[in-house]
Amino acid sequence: PKEIIERMEDGRAVLYASEHSAAATERRAQRTWPKFATAYASVRRSEEAGIRELAETAFHVQAPLGTVDAQDRREQGWFVVRAFDHDEVDAALSEEPVTPQDIHVGDRIRLTRSQITDWRVILPEEMYGPDRSDALLAAIDRLLGLA
């Protein structure tokens, strides 16, 4: 247990969700993808530079990295969205993988919607995910001065 705690504190631990939990998160992310895309487009189109900059920093997606291991598990990586194109995003890996991979922090890849297992939007006031997609759209409206 001590080694596990130390690895978690050092950011060297990989935590695997149960298959049921991971599948539920992925379904929510897929179901709410249009709201995530709408939020991104609204921020990107803003006339205010400070808000437009959020399109480069606030939108994150999670997707599997590499291949499955001997226990049929696969590490998930978080990426910062750099560009949106319908059901695809260009994104940069935001954290170094814990398991050996051919991708590293800052590497950019194109991800399709079907590869996305979760998403997050980190606004100045708080963080939003698929379970709070309606609240995200309301927050974007407030940010843009529409509400």
PLM-predicted stretches and their roles:
Residues 1-147:
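Mixed-charge, low-complexity intrinsically disordered regions
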